[in-house]
């Protein structure tokens, strides 16, 4: 019965909310934090880098918590006017971001370290494995439906495995 601020265009998040038996409350990137901070919703998806700028600590108060678990992965697109940029800009942008992957990961880890330890909640191993299986199933379902691009799926797996090399899906990449 918990209310979850959910980007209503994000099919994966909607499926997670359905799976856990919560109620989806449509939100945007501009409204998810205010809804959480004002108590309109019980749960909000947010990356660690949102904690400070979106003042998520206001909604957490003394009794709130943050699961030390990635329920969602976010990505972004650079939206431009193609005719206003030099030839090859798209490829050079992709190469720039690929070359600075480690810097981006460090930015995320710095944000996580900036969140007070008392807010972090560790899931029991069995529950974490259940969520990992649920999320993998949702990804597979959305990929089969053509919602997820298979190349993007490979990149997102790389991100998950970089963040947690012991993640169960990364074991398939290990050579013994």
Regions from the PLM with identified roles:
Residues 102-176:
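An extracytoplasmic/periplasmic, membrane-proximal ligand-sensing/linker region
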Residues 73-92:
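A bilobed periplasmic-binding-protein/Venus flytrap-type ligand-binding module shared by bacterial periplasmic
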Residues 9-10, 28-30, 44-54, 74, ...:
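Beta->alpha turn/N-cap motifs
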Residues 15, 33-38, 44-63, 68:
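A ligand-binding cleft/hinge motif common to bilobed small-molecule-binding domains
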Residues 22, 37, 41, 98-106:
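Sec-exported extracytoplasmic/periplasmic mature domains
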Residues 1-38:
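Bilobed "Venus flytrap"/periplasmic-binding protein-like clamshell domains
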């Amino acid at each position: 019965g918990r209310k979850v601020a959910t980007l209503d265009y994000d099919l994966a998040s909607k499926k997670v909310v359905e799976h856990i038996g919560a109620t989806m409350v449509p939100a945007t990137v501009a409204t998810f934090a205010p809804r959480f901070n004002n108590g309109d919703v019980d749960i909000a998806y947010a990356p660690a880098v949102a904690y400070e700028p979106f003042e998520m600590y206001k909604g957490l108060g003394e009794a709130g918590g943050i699961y030390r678990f990635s329920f969602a992965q976010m990505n972004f697109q650079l939206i431009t006017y193609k005719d206003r940029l030099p030839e090859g800009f798209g490829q050079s942008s992709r190469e720039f971001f690929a070359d600075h992957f480690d810097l981006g990961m460090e930015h995320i880890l710095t944000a996580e370290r900036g969140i007070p330890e008392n807010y972090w909640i560790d899931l029991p191993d069995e529950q974490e494995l259940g969520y990992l299986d649920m999320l993998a199933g949702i990804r597979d379902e959305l990929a089969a439906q053509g919602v997820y691009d298979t190349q993007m799926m490979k990149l997102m797996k790389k991100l998950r495995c970089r963040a947690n090399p012991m993640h169960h899906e990364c074991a398939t990449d290990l050579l013994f």
